[in-house]
Amino acid sequence: XQDPQSETDYSQLSGEWNT
């Protein structure tokens, strides 16, 4: 996704948003 709120999405992209 493109939402930083989506921890599930960014967890794979950045891994830092998974908090």
From Swiss-Prot:
Keywords: Allergen, Secreted, Transport. The keyword RNA-binding does not apply. It comes from the Eukaryota. Its main location: secreted. Transmembrane segments: none annotated. GO terms for cellular component: extracellular region. It is found in: Secreted. Belongs to the calycin superfamily. Lipocalin family. This is Dander allergen Equ c 2.0102. It comes from Equus caballus. The lineage of its organism: Eukaryota, Metazoa, Chordata, Craniata, Vertebrata.
